[in-house]
Amino acid sequence: MSDLPLPPAFRQLGHSGIAVSPIAWGMWRLAENGRTPADAAKLVHAALDAGINFLDTADIYGFDGSAGFGDAEALLGEVLAAEPALRERMILATKGGILPPLPYDQSADYLRKAIDDSLARLKVDVIDLWQIHRPDILAHPYEVARVLDDAVSSGKVRALGVSNFTKDQIAALNHFLGEKLATTQPEISPLRIDCFENGELDQAMMLGLTPMAWSPLGGGRLASPQTARDKAVADALDAVAQAQGVSRTVAAYSWLMAHPAGIVPIIGSQQAARIAEGAEALKVRWNRQDWYAVLVAARGERLP
């Protein structure tokens, strides 16, 4: 029963040369509930103090259907303006390309503006990782690539990524890019296992992309499983969690991190203790039998 390797203290972000923690903190809900810059600063410190240096946001975060576009970036920008030294401790990722109500715009003019606007809201000179949030079917990948390459060559962006792209969309964009993609961000969790068998992670390994997993806890379904399948997955995670003295949440993060593609789960919580807890996943060791037990539970049938 062979053990799988523990994740390294830092992962390389694709071929970019940027080193990131093997787990990230996401700020989808940072601007909710009247959170102040002081409140947000406590969360940033919680992540950094736990060794989580990879922070992921997006220009759409904060939008409530009528207002709030850019609010999460702007709130983080206030934190960085008040404590400039924090910027040197983090790898900062953001996303753009969703523009309600269109819903997507990756025209050259809009992409340039989106990057500049994010820089302004974040109050930074450079974005470490800029990602296209969702694909615009009306945008030619050649034109998109030109804008992204320009953003890198001008020093506004260090590395490039995509989110919610299909394998073919990744291949098409990467073909035209001079500065090749460093990351892909699909939904991955013990309850969302498509990418393990549909070739997405195989492509990531082939191209040297770092997969970033959004919603790694299945949108809260792992915390309160309702279906027989979800309960079976939770039970399989609990077997390892209880043996190693961690929570089911931590076991779920570590299960993703054990995959050879180097998946980086994105913590979605906006609670300091839950953010810090995520760092415990680096210490959880999986063996093949236990890892496959989770996969089999998620599939709902035995492997062939």
UniProtKB/Swiss-Prot annotation:
InterPro entries: AKR, AKR_Detox_Biosynth, Aldo/ket_reductase_CS, NADP_OxRdtase_dom, NADP_OxRdtase_dom_sf. NADP(+) binds at residues 28-29, 56, 163-164, 185, 215, 217, 219, 268-270, 274. GO terms for molecular function: oxidoreductase activity. PROSITE patterns: ALDOKETO_REDUCTASE_2. D-glucose binds at residues 61, 133-134. One of its GO terms (cellular component) is cytosol. The keyword Nucleotide-binding does not apply. It catalyses: D-glucose + NADP(+) = 6-dehydro-D-glucose + NADPH + H(+). Belongs to the aldo/keto reductase family. This is 6-dehydroglucose reductase.
